[in-house]
Amino acid sequence: MRELYLKTLKKEVVPSEGCTEPIAIAYAASIAAEHLKGEIKEVNIYLSKNVIKNALGVGIPGTGGVGIEIAAALGISIQKSYKKLTILSNFTEDELKKAKEIVDKNIINIKQKNTNKALYIEVELLSETSKAKVIIEDTHTNVTLIECDDEIIMDNNSEVSEDLEEDYKLFKIADIYNFAKEVDFDHIKFILESAKMNEKVSEEGLKGDYGLQVGSKIIQKGNFNLFSNDASNKIIAASAAASDARMDGCAMPIMTTAGSGNQGIACSIPVAQTARLLDKSEEELARALVLSNLVTIRIKKHMGRLSPLCGAGIAGATGASCGITYLLGGDLENINYCINNMISDLSGMICDGAKETCALKIATGTNAAIQCANLAINGISATANDGIVAKDVEETIESIETLIQNGFKNVDDTILNIMLEKKKNNK
């Protein structure tokens, strides 16, 4: 399992600039634009409901705008698909100007795709003489089709890309814990970059007026503040501030986990902040981050790549709580307690799209992560008498999947309908 865990971390913990759903749209649009011949006359974008939900209201870095249209137009303008999830980094003023001109032409059409896939992106570009189509499925960079003028340039079976993901359900918590504890430090040093990168965004969020300013107001000095300036609130503030900045379009890269920047923030910053407060070594931090990220990835596999439940607040924060428990000296039993406590606490947190208020959910999740780690390290755990918690922690995690599949079937549709109706009424 050692090589599988390392391969997974390198595949799932990767940098991105901005929210991953609109970036994936930009990525697909960029590929299509690179193949199209002639001047673009029409842009048709077909998206799964989950992608629409997560791309509709989120800030696009460096544009001052939000949403799908400007993201797609930037992808068309930039045409640097080799950058994948960093495609929106360091674009020029001319590229932004061209993107805004595309938006202003009102040639971008967005439609919901009738598909069972949570993550589906199809971009079709038309000129007077040419047509190019690109499809991304299942994960944010998994291109399954490139077609130009009825010629298939690439046709990739999306199921192949899921081979590794299918293994994620085999990631038992005991195995993850033992790997994090015993793996050679040299093999996991790379994971430290996730904390370093995300804490830079946190610092920017704390000093800037981003979003709701959730993070900066928690530790605000001078005026009356209900929050005391204690260790836990510093950790919560640092975590929320990174999301404040990211969701308001801060043009800085973030290290994602399992396809989400907010999940990357949620599972890395609380762990890094705790390690610093406890004066832990880089090796101890790396091991805690490995544990946190792999637990997040494991839980996310049961939730789905995109989900009606909040991945950052549930999976990411649970990963963070495990990492914090580890740094506090917890063993496998304490880690199991921690997971049971977290799922008992946060399992009902919905995902109502990517937007500025995600920082509130990260603040809530981080607070729970600290609280549940504190309980776990003191030998206190939710039990099989408590709701969806099971005697075996593996069953507790699996209950999240059952909850989503059987209990949340119509939640995404309901949330998206509310969002679209609101947008229509605000026009």
Swiss-Prot record:
Any one GO molecular function term: L-cysteine desulfhydrase activity
Q: Which InterPro entries match?
A: Ser_deHydtase-like_asu (IPR005130), UPF0597 (IPR021144)
Which Pfam families does the protein's record reference?
SDH_alpha (PF03313)
One GO process term, biological-process aspect: L-cysteine catabolic process to pyruvate
Lineage, top-rank taxon, reads: Bacteria
What family does the entry list?
Belongs to the UPF0597 family.
Q: Which PANTHER family match?
A: UPF0597 PROTEIN YHAM (PTHR30501:SF2)
Name the chain's protein.
Answer: UPF0597 protein CPF_0803
Organism field: Clostridium perfringens (strain ATCC 13124 / DSM 756 / JCM 1290 / NCIMB 6125 / NCTC 8237 / Type A)
